[in-house]
């Protein structure tokens, strides 16, 4: 008589997605949502399961094209750094910068598993002095869409023309620094890629007027 072991062996061997693959799929979805909110074109047909190509053994890249050139550095390249299980050092940063230069990219997002070493952070700051913008995220920050949290109000980045109209309406003599501020280190500011001097419109539900609107300058 066949025992339990022979019965179980007759079951089809179906490969299950690894935890790493599922994690990377979530990151890929969040990246697409984030870049969409920033005004970049995103392939709507991209299957999240394709995130498996972002294997941390190699530096892999995806480039996003902006829908509008206003307020952007042109295409944004997203790199998944290769130092699996460790902080990313200067070497991978230099390799990424070389690839950016060869591809004529001036804006990049680097996704690291556990962060960057202090020298790598310094290297990023130095390259940004040359007019290149580099943003860094750890994977844990991209496991969810911060804008989908029920307590996060709607944020809309004003165009330069809208900003000028606002400053005139508030009679601020063109000085946006007189507005309340939001720091570039704020999670929503980082998610939206806000930079110094930009103005963001924040809409919150209000019990009296239905919707409360405030404006903040990025500091």
Predicted segments, located by residue:
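Short, structured beta-strand/loop micro-motifs enriched in basic residues and often containing a Trp
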Residues: 174-186
């Amino acid at each position: 008589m066949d025992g339990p072991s022979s019965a179980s062996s007759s079951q089809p061997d179906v490969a299950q997605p690894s935890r790493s693959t599922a994690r990377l799929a979530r990151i890929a979805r969040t990246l697409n949502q984030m870049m969409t909110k920033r005004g970049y074109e995103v392939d709507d047909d991209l299957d999240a399961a394709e995130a498996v190509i972002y294997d941390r053994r190699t530096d892999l890249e995806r480039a996003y094209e902006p829908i509008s050139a206003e307020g952007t550095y042109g295409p944004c390249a997203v790199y998944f750094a290769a130092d699996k299980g460790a902080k990313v050092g200067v070497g991978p940063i230099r390799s990424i910068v070389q690839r950016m230069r060869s591809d004529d990219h001036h804006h990049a997002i680097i996704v690291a598993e556990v962060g960057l070493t202090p020298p790598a952070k310094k290297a990023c700051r130095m390259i940004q002095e040359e007019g290149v913008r580099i943003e860094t995220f750890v994977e844990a920050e991209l496991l969810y869409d911060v804008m989908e949290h029920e307590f996060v109000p709607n944020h809309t980045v004003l165009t330069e023309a809208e900003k000028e109209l606002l400053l005139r309406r508030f009679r601020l003599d063109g000085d946006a620094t007189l507005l309340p501020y939001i720091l570039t280190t704020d999670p929503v500011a980082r998610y939206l890629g806000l930079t110094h001097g930009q103005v963001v419109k924040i809409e919150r539900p209000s019990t009296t007027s239905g919707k409360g609107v405030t404006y903040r300058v990025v500091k």
